[in-house]
């Protein structure tokens, strides 16, 4: 699902017929921003999106055999940053941002009709929402807290909504994406705007642990996370420095698949996690230090060492 900038419509593309077919689903005004898509057990399509013209949260589905669009929440300027998920009973769950009140909101039809809830009203919260369901159909939502510049997380797994600040370092939580593994452990990727890093948070150890997993340049915007059948983590994201799409994988123990270095390289140098190349220009003096480069894939790991010293040299002509 996507927004058609020229016609201001919600569009949908699929290759289920064997070739790509595109359809204009909603053409009633300026519609289709912040779109999110999910598929139910019958392979019917469900899409949440923002209606700019009417400032509403809208929803589209083809489960009846043809496309039907519905205004779900019309109370103020609502429906930004939508994310949609389908539970084991094919009920729909949508998280989104209420721009009028600055709140994280949630809508579901699991009772048979749409019920709307304000989950977090503590400041300006709910930007960049991402939703996922666990094996019990409990809801998990990651989002950005604009007031405190934090990554936040909300869940109803205890029977009522509980919100938690996961990462409280400066300017983190942008473009969050959430997924759950086979043990219902939570995994969140997000962008650290202050440092320009891709960050990753998980509670699989029993408490939240956050890690900067790519620090090579300005990386981590527009992140998306997925978990495979072996509980390995897969994350896609933007490399703003090189204008590239990047990918990083972590095994089920949260070890980065690819290259890593320990300790941190001298200021101004960075390691390309895909190629193992060290590049950059040192910006500070550094004593003679040995760095361990580790490369890891599904077959195992290997290491090598490199020694780097940064001295203050007299300029030459």
Sequence positions of predicted segments:
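Extracellular, repeat-based ectodomains that mediate carbohydrate processing or recognition
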Residues: 1-253
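Hydrophobic beta-strand positions in extracellular immunoglobulin-like domains
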Residues: 249, 282, 295-297
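Short, solvent-exposed loop/linker segments at beta-strand-coil boundaries, enriched for Pro/Gly
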Residues: 258-270
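Conserved glycine-centered beta-strand/turn positions repeated across beta-sheet architectures
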Residues: 259, 278-282, 287
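Strand-loop-strand motifs at the edges of beta-sheets in extracellular beta-sandwich domains
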Residues: 267-282
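A short beta-strand micro-motif common to beta-rich folds, especially ectodomain repeats
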Residues: 286-298
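C-terminal edge beta-strand
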Residues: 300-312
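Proline-enriched interdomain boundary motifs that mark the N-terminal boundary
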Residues: 313-317
């Amino acid at each position: 699902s996507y927004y058609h900038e020229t016609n201001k419509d919600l569009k949908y593309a699929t290759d289920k017929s064997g070739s790509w077919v595109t359809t204009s689903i909603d053409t009633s005004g300026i519609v289709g921003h912040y779109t999110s898509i999910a598929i139910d057990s019958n392979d019917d399509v469900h899409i949440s999106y923002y209606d700019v013209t009417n400032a509403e949260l809208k929803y589209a589905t083809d489960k009846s055999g043809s496309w039907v669009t519905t205004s779900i929440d019309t109370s103020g300027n609502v429906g930004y940053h939508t994310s949609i998920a389908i539970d084991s009973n094919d009920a729909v769950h949508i998280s989104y941002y209420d721009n009028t009140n600055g709140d994280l909101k949630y809508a579901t039809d699991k009772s048979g009709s749409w019920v709307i809830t304000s989950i977090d009203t503590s400041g300006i919260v709910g930007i960049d929402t991402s939703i996922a369901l666990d094996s019990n159909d409990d809801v998990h939502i990651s989002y950005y807290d604009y007031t405190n510049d934090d990554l936040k997380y909300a869940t109803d797994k205890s029977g009522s909504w509980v919100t938690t600040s996961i990462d409280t370092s400066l300017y983190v939580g942008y473009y969050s994406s959430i997924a759950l593994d086979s043990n219902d452990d939570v995994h969140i990727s997000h962008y650290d705007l202050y440092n320009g890093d891709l960050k990753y948070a998980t509670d699989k150890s029993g408490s939240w642990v956050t890690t900067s997993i790519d620090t090579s340049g300005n990386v981590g915007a527009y992140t998306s996370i997925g978990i495979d059948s072996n509980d390995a983590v897969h994350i896609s994201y933007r490399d703003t420095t090189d204008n590239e799409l990047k990918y990083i994988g972590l095994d089920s123990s949260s070890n980065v698949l690819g290259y890593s270095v320990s300790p941190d390289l001298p200021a101004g140098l960075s390691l390309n996690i895909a190629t193992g190349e060290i590049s950059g220009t040192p910006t500070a003096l550094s004593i003679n230090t040995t760095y361990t480069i580790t490369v890891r894939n599904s077959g195992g790991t290997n290491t090598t060492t490199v020694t780097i010293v940064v001295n203050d040299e007299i300029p030459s002509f």
